[in-house]
Amino acid sequence: ALIERGCDVISQHSDSTAPATTAEENGVWQVGYNNDMIEAAPKASLISARIDWGIYVTEAVQAMIDGKEIPTDWCKGLGDEAVYLSPLNTDIAAEGTQEAIDEAKEKLISGEIHVFEGPLKGTSPEGETIEIAEGDYYHEQEEKSAPSWCYIVEGCLVVE
């Protein structure tokens, strides 16, 4: 449905190659999650975000060894190397893409930019609204590890 409606970049939160291969079959780009999808769809897959659970497992095992409580609400990210990017598919990426990714990554780690940065407005499926002012951002996962962004951002196309 997304591709039919004109979406030219597909991503997913699944452990399946189906979005990547579907993107390739339809001539659109794909950004993976949890697995590098370049082998599955070399003409469509640009890059993937991945989680390094080894960092959490190491902390949990160390907590057990030390007789401490195992952390169950765990928040780590790019700066902690708990989230990382697979290598960029340089065979299909535009010139300068790696440099742009590196710059954005540095700014995210330093806190210079944020994922949900204002100004933006959104509405949750329950009708709750949020408005983030210029210069402010949504503080997701600072107090809990579960994703908490559930808003449809004003101006985004919703496909049902």
What kind of region is each of these model predictions?
Residues 1-160:
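A residue-level marker of the well-folded mature domains of exported/periplasmic proteins
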